[in-house]
């Protein structure tokens, strides 16, 4: 009889397309297609990123030029403000200079002229009064002296005779004692001369001439009247210098510096898109190749493993036949044969039986449950579910590599905003610093050139006023120093002129010490305010970077959704296999309940006998999976593959 089964070597010819290898090959194909899809999308997204990058650079350049554009507007405002303020200050200052000069000159002229007239009139009237009084006094004195001298002369003439007689006697007595002659007429002459001198006493008319001449010596202050010209001269000089000063020419916008526009090519220079996507594609391709190689190795390993498995299954089939033949005389031959076949058909039960000791009370239910969940149908569901989960995991690994790389790209794109803000902040700060420095130099020039001249003029006027006061005092003292008019005149001049001039001098001194201008400068927080407003309003750059990040997110989300669908499907398939466990446990519970009912004693009618089971036909053996030959009547060929089922 020819054999109708496959031997071991014939079975090996079909091992290479076993279900495990086929699943691994399908997983490899899935990974390959997934990788190609990602690489294709990366190529498309590379072009999109380059387009966005170009737009980002263009927009960033426009944004970075905002400080320069802003500085142009500010420069116009600063130049216009400085020019207007300088011209208005110049006009106001020249007006003030003219007013001050005119007031000082007017004040000096009006008081000096007024009080020269007052002094001249007062002194002239006083001199005239003194002259008239002196003339009357002189006339009266002269007449009195002449009258008195004549009366005295008459008395002296009589007295002279007596004295002369007496003197003659005295001379004689003296001559008697001294033997010298004495001339007594000497004394008479002296007496007569004294009377003549008294007669000649007369207040000269030159006194009247001196008093009259004193009136002509009243100071006219002609030298002091030149003070007006001296006071006016510094003001005229400063007016001329201000008109000729170059610092008061109009400031042009070109003289002010503009905020620099930094070159902004972050995306083009800092971000090498070609290199990024090339490296990313290499990473994806490398990871995919590794996964595919591993899967192919696993497929080859599955083939090799099944070769070994088939070998052991062939050996187990021979042992199974031997055990069946050994149990052919047992009463439970049918159940025992099926248990033996089940043990050898299930590798899991076979090795548990071989290496694990299980209580007999639980062995049947455990082996039955293992047989139920490891049938070819259940194992197919389990393998497909696990293979699906494993495939999803591998695809997630590839996707995670892309996600990690894109995070660095997104970080760089997001960092562009910070870099642009930093550049704009530096440019704006530098511009504000330079502009404030220029305004400070203009302020110094105005204080030095404009108010410096004012201070010079004030000092000169102060000096002139001091000279004026000194000359005025000198002039007055030269005339009235030793006269009764000295103190009143000095008091009058001080109260009317000197006091006012001292106040003017104090005012000019205050101007010298306090005259300065402080120009307003650009606020330092202008940069902070500008950058704060920019950060709130820079939707453009946000939109561009968000387009890239949203595109990346959309791409990754699409693949994630696809993988999640695969994950759900694989989990559902695996859940079906887990459901088999629940069904198996339910069937065990149901079978245990049925067995308990079957064990209940029933009333037996008649004498119990044990019947002989009816042998199965050939068709029934084939239907139930038993050997379709009778092992008791025919010789069994143990090389049949039927026992490997």
UniProtKB/Swiss-Prot annotation:
Assigned GO CC terms: mating projection tip; plasma membrane
Key words, A-Z: Cell membrane, Conjugation, Glycoprotein, Membrane, Transmembrane, Transmembrane helix
Cross-referenced InterPro entries: PRM1
GO biological process: one example: plasma membrane fusion involved in cytogamy
Chain coiled-coil ranges: none
Basic and acidic residues composition bias: residue spans: 624-637
Glycan attachment positions: 142, 192, 226, 250, 426, 462, 473, 514, 525, 533, 547
Membrane topology: Multi-pass membrane protein
Topology, Extracellular side: 1-21, 124-289, 400-568
Protein name, entry field: Plasma membrane fusion protein PRM1
């Amino acid at each position: 009889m020819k054999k109708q089964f496959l031997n071991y070597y014939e079975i090996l010819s079909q091992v290479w397309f076993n279900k495990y290898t086929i699943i691994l090959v399908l997983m490899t194909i899935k990974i390959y297609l997934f990788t190609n899809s990602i690489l294709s999308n990366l190529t498309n997204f590379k072009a999109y990123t380059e387009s966005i990058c170009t737009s980002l650079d263009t927009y960033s350049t426009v944004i970075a030029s905002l400080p320069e554009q802003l500085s142009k507007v500010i420069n116009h405002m600063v130049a216009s403000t400085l020019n207007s303020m300088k011209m208005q200050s110049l006009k106001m200052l020249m007006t003030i200079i003219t007013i001050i000069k005119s007031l000082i000159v007017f004040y000096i002229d009006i008081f000096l002229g007024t009080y020269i007239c007052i002094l001249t009139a007062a002194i002239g009237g006083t001199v005239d009064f003194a002259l008239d009084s002196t003339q009357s006094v002189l006339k009266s004195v002269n007449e009195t002296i002449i009258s008195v001298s004549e009366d005295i002369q008459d008395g002296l003439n009589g007295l002279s005779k007596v004295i002369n007689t007496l003197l003659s006697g005295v001379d004689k007595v003296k001559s008697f004692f001294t033997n010298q002659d004495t001339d007594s007429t000497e004394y008479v002459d002296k007496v007569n001369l004294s009377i003549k001198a008294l007669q000649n006493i007369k207040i000269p008319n030159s006194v009247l001439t001196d008093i009259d001449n004193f009136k002509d010596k009243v100071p006219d202050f002609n030298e002091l009247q030149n003070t007006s010209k001296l006071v006016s001269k510094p003001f005229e000089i400063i007016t001329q210098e201000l008109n000729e000063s170059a610092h008061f020419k109009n400031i042009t916008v070109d003289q002010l510096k503009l905020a620099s526009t930094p070159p902004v090519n972050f995306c083009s220079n800092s971000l090498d898109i070609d290199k990024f996507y090339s490296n990313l594609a290499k990473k994806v391709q490398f990871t995919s190749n590794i996964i595919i190689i591993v899967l192919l190795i696993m497929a080859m390993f599955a083939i090799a493993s099944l070769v070994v498995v088939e070998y052991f299954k062939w050996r187990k089939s021979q042992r199974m036949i031997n055990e069946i033949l050994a149990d052919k005389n047992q009463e439970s031959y049918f159940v025992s044969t099926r248990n033996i076949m089940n043990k050898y058909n299930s590798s899991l039960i076979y090795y548990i039986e071989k290496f694990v000791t299980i209580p007999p009370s639980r062995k049947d239910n455990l082996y039955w449950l293992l047989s139920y969940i490891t049938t070819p149908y259940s194992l197919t569901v389990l393998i497909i579910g696990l293979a699906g989960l494993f495939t999803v995991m591998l695809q997630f690994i590839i996707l995670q590599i892309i996600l990690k790389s894109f995070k660095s790209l997104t970080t760089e794109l997001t960092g562009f905003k910070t870099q642009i803000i930093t550049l704009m902040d530096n440019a704006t700060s530098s511009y504000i610093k330079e502009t404030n420095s220029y305004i400070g130099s203009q302020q110094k020039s105005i204080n030095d050139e404009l108010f410096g001249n004012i201070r010079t003029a004030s000092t000169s006027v102060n000096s002139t006023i001091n000279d004026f006061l000194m000359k005025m005092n000198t002039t007055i003292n030269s005339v009235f120093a030793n006269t009764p008019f000295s103190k009143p005149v000095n008091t009058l001049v001080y109260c009317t002129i000197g006091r006012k001039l001292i106040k003017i001098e104090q005012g000019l001194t205050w101007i010298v010490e306090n005259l300065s201008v402080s120009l307003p400068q650009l606020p330092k927080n202008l940069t902070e305010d500008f950058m704060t407003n920019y950060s709130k309003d820079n939707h453009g750059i946000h939109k561009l970077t968000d387009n890239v990040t949203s595109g990346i997110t959309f791409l990754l989300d699409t693949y994630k959704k696809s993988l999640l669908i695969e994950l759900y499907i694989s989990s559902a398939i695996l859940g079906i296999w887990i459901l088999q466990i629940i069904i198996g446990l339910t069937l065990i519970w149901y079978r245990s309940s049925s067995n308990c009912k079957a064990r209940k004693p029933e009333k037996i009618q008649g004498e119990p006998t044990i019947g002989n089971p009816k042998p199965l036909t050939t068709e029934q053996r084939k239907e139930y999976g038993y050997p379709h030959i009778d092992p008791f009547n025919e010789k069994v060929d143990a090389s049949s593959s039927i026992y490997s089922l």
